[in-house]
Amino acid sequence: TIHGRALVRSGLLVTAVCTDCHGDHNIQKHSHPDSTIGRNHVVETCGKCHAGVAAVFRESIHGRKLAEGSALAPVCTTCHSAHRIARTDAQGYQLHIVRECGDCHGEYLATYRDTYHGKITSLGYTKVARCSDCHSRRK
């Protein structure tokens, strides 16, 4: 995981370990309603270390849909699988994020692919506008 690599490769002294996310007692499958990594609690779990990101998420369209009880609303792990997380400054991440958005927003991905930005992205160039550059709370 990115957390394990942070500890081993980057030499960080403090990083998340298994029990930080999964707990150390009463561990449940992610599909269980009481699971710390299930959709009912994962924003809170991730927010223990990523408070700023969790706050931004709660104010986003996805966070608001989750608060309204939408079963279709994505949560942290919908786009950021805890065991496949990549650094946002990694080479392939910028290309990967377009595909992640397209998993749920396929009709918009098809339109994006027809634009200048989409064509450049398909060639592997990463310094180009992506979904979140225009469709983000940070605008």
Model segments located where?
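Short sequence/structural segments immediately N-terminal
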Residues: T1-K139
